[in-house]
Amino acid sequence: MKKPAPTQQPTNQKDGLKAWIVFLGGGLAYCMAMCARTSFGVAVPWADQRFGLSSAQLAVFIMGQLAVYAAAQIPVGLLLDRYGSRKVLTCGLIIVGLGQLALAQAHTFPTALAARALVGAGDATAFIGVVRFLPAWFSASRVPLLTQITNVGGQIGQVISAFPVVWWLHDYGWSTSFNLVALAVFMAAVATAVLVRDDPSGTKTPVAQTESVRRSMGAVLRNRATWVGWMIHATAAFPFNVIALMWGSAWMRQGMHLSDTVSATMLSLEGLFLVAAGIPAGIISGRWPRRRLQTCLAAYAISVLTWVVGLALSPSAAAALIAIIGAAIASCVGALGFDIVREYTQRSRWGVAIGTVNTGGFVSSIIAVELVGLILDLRGGARTGGDFIVAFGAMGVIIAVLVVSLLIVSRRLHPQVGIPQES
């Protein structure tokens, strides 16, 4: 008896127009979350005047936001596995908008800190919410590149914070500026609810809900791919976040005495360099998945070299440009950690697995941001160019520890494929 021909998927199920519309909605959500995330970094000089805080206290703003972000990743991953990206992304953006509204009205350190914590909690849904639905809408060969496009596309949000937000702060002041950011985030939440769908089939709950949280978490944490991905992301993300989220604007304006326009231009270039480096990284990950680890190590080495050169030339605009290039080169390979863990994790656990990996970069960023702030205070708090050289140079210790840890975790990789298999 002749076997029936396999059922063909409709062409619009994957890689079709509807898939790209959904991707656009998710990209908009991440873009506006990134704008809110980085808006405080460009506002540090204004925060100085508004709250009158030390460098270490200012760093607590970002450290607190990132701590909430990192702590929320695994719970958000569990929510994504049970309720899907559309609901979680929309709710996350609403929380981000409320945080920005609270920050606009804040006049004390504790109130502003609580507002930034709200931003961190909502922001925690954005990137992994998009990455979670990509395999449902696109073919496997396209997912690594689209993960990178999501990552670099979110940098448009950093450009928004580097230019319009700075202009608003100059022209309208603190409260109006952050109210405008909140309004933009709420508009993005509406667009996300309209455009994003979890699955081509229209299933409301895209994965099974029968597995217990304990079992799901245990399986993810026992998977060696999770920890390889975690180390990759931790090493890649923190130089970029130190510049974009906290100390980049202060370094250029106070340590180098560059103008607001030049500083904003440099910060926007960080996002553009990430685009330039991220797209090739996504192509490499998709075409040569067995070379992902080597690609990451090469990017880290190039990044360290550019930072050394940049700090040697400081203070100058060229120094800032070179350091920003180095941060972008490292950051572009962070998404390869998601590619690895997604390939070796059961689909019903993708949310919690991706969330776990995503904590890596933000744990390392918390440590690095606070380390820079503490060193600046120990050197007198004047924030001269020399102070920033010493503070940024100390981040080399973090890089060294993380790279050695990655090499140790990777020692038991499968000899043929170069990627760990799930235990």
Please report, for each region that a protein language model flagged, where it lies by residue:
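Extracytoplasmic gate region of multi-pass secondary transporters
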Residues: 40-42, 224-278, 368-373
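Juxtamembrane intracellular "pre-TM" segments in multi-pass secondary transporters
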Residues: 7-16, 199-230, 423
